[in-house]
């Protein structure tokens, strides 16, 4: 997505399909359907190898074309690309002088399994929540915490979700009937996230106040529903279904509706146990990256409805703790948590645009000026006009 922008601004730029090629499958590509086995060579390409090869080859081509190698090299990625960015930091720290990881899809096993949780809650309760009711819950949260949507000037989003009990909304009238206690129970479970039999949290839930039903530019949400023969049914996120179908069951014909809560929880932990160390891209030892004086810009939308923000917040906290604390990590890391910003800035909330983010990163790498604040802008999705601009402080600047 950023390649045309880079080219228009005079940069040499490169991309890779990671060996995926013209496979028509959107998310089931790791499965070799001829053998019903995972293709680990292709998975290694996806995890890190292809981006490293791209960097090496691109620099050689640039050197041949221009007679000299690039002075500075940068990597920017969002979502899966954000995961790619952190894979470069962790696995190939020498490849890029500056890296921007935005809304990174790390903690892959927990993320994908947890993305199925809202649909599981609605299915198992027999009580899917239509958009009309989800809007009421969100509106109630924003009435109590109006700065969550980013429209009120706020230095940064909180590092933890606000506390809100969905039962406060019970009785509120909507176009599809009043909010019931069952509705509130479903909403609270979605916000809490998956919890195992002994009450241990398996992963985070959606933050209260997050748009989660597809009222955004790409009509995507992990708490979506659809009508089938006049009956409302949960519609799970395709990546979540694919994770179970491909990684867990290795069956392209598997039907998620056959899954009950107990089995889901067992398989959640099984997937983490079996695959986490290989594919989660959450290594926190960045000493090699730091030693090279390379710079990492880590950004996350606090209203992300696809990548649970608290998973990235947790990664950041552990990273800082295990790399000597803020006094050490501030030399190579800045973290920005944007209030009201949806996944990849696909909603109305304010986010860091490519120009602001890359300019800040380049200035840090090339001039030594660390970005303690970055301008964020809210764009009207219909008109493309800027609705407002705010200044977002880094977590480091806020102490």
Residue ranges and their predicted role:
Residues 1-399:
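C-terminal His-loop and adjacent cap/lid subdomain of alpha/beta-hydrolase
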């Amino acid at each position: 997505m950023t390649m045309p922008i880079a080219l228009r601004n005079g940069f040499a730029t490169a991309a890779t399909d990671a060996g995926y090629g013209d496979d028509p499958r959107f998310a089931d590509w790791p499965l070799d359907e001829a053998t019903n086995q995972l293709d680990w060579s292709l998975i290694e390409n996806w995890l890190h190898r292809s981006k490293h090869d791209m960097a090496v080859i691109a620099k050689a081509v640039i050197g041949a074309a221009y007679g000299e190698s690039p002075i500075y090299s940068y990597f920017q990625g969002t979502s899966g690309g954000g995961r790619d960015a952190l894979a470069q930091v962790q696995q190939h720290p020498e490849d890029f002088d500056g890296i921007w990881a935005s809304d990174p899809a790390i903690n892959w096993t927990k993320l994908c399994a947890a993305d199925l949780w809202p649909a599981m809650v609605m299915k198992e309760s027999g009580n899917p929540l239509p958009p009309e009711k989800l809007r009421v819950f969100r509106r109630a949260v924003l009435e109590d915490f109006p700065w969550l949507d980013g429209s009120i000037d706020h230095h940064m989003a909180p590092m933890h979700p606000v506390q809100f009990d969905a039962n406060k909304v019970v009785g509120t009238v909507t176009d599809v009937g009043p909010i019931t206690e069952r509705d509130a129970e479903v909403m609270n479970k979605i916000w809490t996230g998956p919890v195992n039999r002994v009450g241990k949290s398996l992963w985070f839930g959606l933050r209260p106040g997050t748009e989660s039903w597809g009222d955004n530019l790409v009509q995507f949400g992990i708490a979506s529903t659809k009508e089938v023969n006049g009956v409302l049914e949960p519609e799970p996120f395709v990546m979540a279904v694919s994770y179970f179908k491909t990684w867990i069951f290795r069956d392209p014909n598997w039907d998620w509706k056959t899954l009950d809560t107990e089995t889901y929880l067992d398989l959640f932990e099984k997937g983490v146990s079996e695959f986490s160390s290989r594919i989660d891209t959450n290594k926190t030892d960045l000493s090699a990256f730091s030693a090279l004086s390379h710079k990492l810009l880590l950004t996350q939308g606090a209203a992300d409805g696809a990548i649970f923000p608290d998973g990235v917040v947790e990664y950041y906290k552990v990273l800082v703790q295990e790399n000597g604390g803020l006094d050490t990590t501030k030399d190579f890391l800045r973290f920005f948590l944007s209030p009201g910003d949806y996944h990849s800035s696909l909603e109305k909330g304010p986010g860091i645009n490519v120009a602001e983010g890359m300019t800040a990163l380049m200035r840090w790498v090339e001039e030594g000026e660390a970005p303690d604040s970055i301008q964020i802008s809210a764009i009207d999705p219909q008109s493309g006009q800027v609705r407002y601009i705010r200044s977002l402080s880094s977590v480091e600047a806020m102490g």
